[in-house]
Amino acid sequence: VYHAGNWILIILASFLIPILEAALAVTGTLYAATQFKTAPEKFSLLIIQIATVGREYELVQTTINKIHAYQLSMPYQIWVVLEPGFRTDYQGADEIIVVPADYTCPPVDKARALNYCWKIRVERGLARQDIKLMYVDDDTLPSRRYIELGYAGDYDICQGPTIPNRWYAIGGWQHFLMSHLDDPRARNCLTYCSTTQGILGKPLFVHGEGLTITGWTENRIGWDFHIVGSDDLVFGTNAAHQGLKWGYFNAAIQLVSPWTWKEHLKQRHRWLWGNIDAIKNHTVMPKNYGLAVFIKYIIGFVATAISFFGITLLQSGVIVVSPTLQNLFYTSLALWVVSYMVPAWIAAGGEPNRELRPQWWRYWGFKITQALAAGLMTPITAFAPMLVIIYCYFRGRPERFVVIAKNNKFTGV
């Protein structure tokens, strides 16, 4: 048994991170609830743009139907942009845009489609301050509140948290696990997006699902970056770098988690290398933002490893600390577990799950069950991303924007 010396401060510093993150999440959420500025009278039209390769016709059609069912009060249009060779008979879409196969520009794949639609809006005179654009992927559904706040937000660029609550944790053990491995996404939004986007206006993370900007913002930043992935992070950090006004609001952009472990790895592989390419290329992503993202990766790796090591030493009695530090450790441990339970509690709720479980006892029982499951799985959901990142890094850079299957027999769509 060793009595802790000065070196234990390194372990204790790692234990303090969950306390700091809890403070950030509470502060950011309260700030968004009280300080998010709205001015709907400044805007005349909302364009909700759904980007898809074209394989998820049924899922996209469902999203269109849901949005129309909201009976939104603002003037809006739904644009669907897709690749050639797929169905184009979307009902309720105001614009169906097929990107020509021979269209060329600096970015490729999804960012190429964004580039093409941007040029169309410029030609039509829609690159204006009074036009709002909301980017939606083929697996995502903005809640009614999300659309209303995104449209009304008096910002050049804004968004709310991503919540994987569409068919959350159903359809077999793989999707149950993949859903909970998406809990850190919502956790990062609630903790870091709420503060870096909402309070500081200097984003550390940016997600393309639900990103809401003005037509003027799109034309100011543009989609001419030489990128394959991480188009959202590149766009958002460049907007902040050029002094555009960032905002964050409390409403859910609802998405579907990967259905299998294989699809999960494909998705993370694309994300990791998109970030690496952006961080390395200072002509694409501002150097200081790239450095911040890199440091966050390193801190996450080191702190998680040291924390697991420290927990083992403390619980096994190899090292002994004072009762005060012991209490600090248990407080931090409790907050760490709660920080994964809260996203699961949110993801297990919402309108998508109310539709699946109309009886109150099923709805609330599911929320409680998933929150408890997330608490028990905290070591897995915290540690697994480290292993996934290592695997994806050594797998090498993907040459294309890898798309995963979003629909499944369990959706009933």
Region locations from a protein language model:
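Short beta-strand-to-loop acidic/aromatic patch adjacent to the donor-nucleotide binding site
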Residues: 127-141
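Short beta-strand/loop segment that forms part of the nucleotide-sugar
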Residues: 75-85, 99-100
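Short, acidic, metal-binding catalytic loop of nucleotide-sugar glycosyltransferases
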Residues: 62-76
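Acidic donor-binding loop at a coil-to-helix junction in glycosyltransferase catalytic cores
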Residues: 229-235
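Long helical/loop segments within the catalytic core of UDP-sugar-dependent glycosyltransferases
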Residues: 104-124, 146-228, 265, 269-280
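Catalytic donor-sugar/metal-binding loop of nucleotide-sugar-dependent glycosyltransferases
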Residues: 237-254
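Juxtamembrane C-terminal module of membrane proteins
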Residues: 23-45, 67-69, 284, 289, ...
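N-proximal low-complexity "stem/linker" segments adjacent to membrane-targeting elements
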Residues: 1-62
